[in-house]
Structure formats: structure tokens, C-alpha cells
Curated annotation (Swiss-Prot):
Plays a role in viral genome replication by driving entry of quiescent cells into the cell cycle. Stimulation of progression from G1 to S phase allows the virus to efficiently use the cellular DNA replicating machinery to achieve viral genome replication. E7 protein has both transforming and trans-activating activities. Induces the disassembly of the E2F1 transcription factor from RB1, with subsequent transcriptional activation of E2F1-regulated S-phase genes. Interferes with host histone deacetylation mediated by HDAC1 and HDAC2, leading to transcription activation. HAMAP family: PPV_E7. It comes from Human papillomavirus 44. This is Protein E7. Keywords: Activator, DNA-binding, Early protein, G1/S host cell cycle checkpoint dysregulation by virus, Host cytoplasm, Host nucleus, Host-virus interaction, Inhibition of host innate immune response by virus, Inhibition of host interferon signaling pathway by virus, Interferon antiviral system evasion, Metal-binding, Modulation of host cell cycle by virus, Oncogene, Transcription, Transcription regulation, Viral immunoevasion, Zinc, Zinc-finger. A zinc finger (unnamed) spans 57-93. GO terms for biological process: DNA-templated transcription; symbiont-mediated perturbation of host cell cycle G1/S transition checkpoint; symbiont-mediated suppression of host innate immune response; symbiont-mediated suppression of host type I interferon-mediated signaling pathway. Belongs to the papillomaviridae E7 protein family. The gene is E7. One of its GO terms (molecular function) is DNA-binding transcription factor activity.
Length: 97
């Protein structure tokens, strides 16, 4: 609209509802693409690499550092264990147990 006052010429009414648009996609992936993605995921999980872990001693709360070599899946398992009931002991506290 232009100007200070509206006129009937400037008002546009749409009496018909808009056409519905289908939102479903009919495209399908080839099974070979799925297999390539799955193999790439497995390959990255099977590669072992070193991980440095810094945690605290379960007895005296000193900082403990260790390095492990494992796969990505295994480091996630270790992370879950460390968040649970698994405690790492420092060299000072280990002989006392």
C-alpha cells in the first residue's frame, strides 16, 4: 500500500486456498551408497590410535595420567567405565591395597 489511507483498489483478496504441496520425497538411495557409508564407519572405528587419559586417583584424588591404544568404540567403553564405578589408582596408593 502506498499513502496514508487504504483504498479498495489496494486490497487483494485471495478467495481460493493455495494449492497443497506434497512434502514427501520419492527419491531412494541405492543400496551401494548405504554399504559404502557403513564400511567407512566401520573402518574409522577399527583404526587404533593412542588416547591420553587424565583422571584422578580413586583414593587420594591426585592427578593420574595414562595413555592407551584402542579403537574409537573401545575408548567410549572406557569412558563409560570411568564415569561409573571404575577407579584408577596412582602409584602411591596402588601398593597400599
Amino acid at each position: 500500500m502506498h499513502g496514508n489511507y487504504t483504498t479498495l483498489k489496494e486490497i487483494v483478496l485471495q478467495l481460493e486456498p493455495p494449492d497443497p504441496v506434497g512434502l514427501h520425497c520419492n527419491e531412494q538411495l541405492d543400496s551401494s551408497e548405504d554399504e559404502v557409508d557403513e564400511l567407512a564407519t566401520q573402518a574409522t572405528q577399527d583404526v587404533t590410535q593412542p588416547y591420553q587419559i587424565v583422571t584422578t586417583c580413586g583414593t587420594c584424588s591426585r592427578k593420574v595420567r595414562l595413555v592407551v591404544q584402542c579403537t574409537g568404540t573401545d575408548i567410549h567403553h572406557l569412558h563409560t567405565l570411568l564415569l561409573g564405578s571404575l577407579d584408577i589408582l596412582c602409584p602411591v596408593c596402588a601398593p597400599k591395597t
